[in-house]
Amino acid sequence: MLDGAKEIIPGAIGYYKDNTISWLDKQLTRYEKRPVIILQHFPLLPPKELNSHKVYQPEKYFEVLNKHKNVIAIVSGHYHLNGEKMQNGIYHISTPALLKPPYSYKIIDIVTTKEFSPMIYTELRPVDVK
């Protein structure tokens, strides 16, 4: 689980510190033969273009991702919006929030076989607030 350093940059912008990126690099090397899913607060590929919410200086993070081929997905929130994008073989999944309408959550299924790369399926489900 990664979270951007809010104490460095105030506001809604996220920032992944160098020691966090270094830790991620070591973990991805350690588990290089396994498919990895990263859970984090700030998305690298936002579901909506809002300059006020972007990750500050994501280049080092992308360098680490490009170096390792075992990351299959990154799941994040922050925008409170549903969205999915694919970049360089990594599925970037943004999840909605439960605190405001439309109240919903996301189910993520990952299917793996020895013959094929992992396949990821997502389903957005409404929350019954009655």
Language model region names:
Residues 3-4, 13-16, 51, 105-109:
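Surface-exposed beta-strand edges and their flanking turn/coil or helix-capping segments
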Residues 82-130:
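Binuclear metal-dependent phosphoesterase catalytic core
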Residues 9-91:
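His/acidic metal-ligating clusters that form di-metal
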Residues 8, 45-46, 101, 129:
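Flexible, glycine-rich phosphate/dinucleotide-binding loops
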Residues 1-6, 37-39, 91-96, 123-124:
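Active-site-proximal beta-strand elements of phosphoester/diester hydrolases
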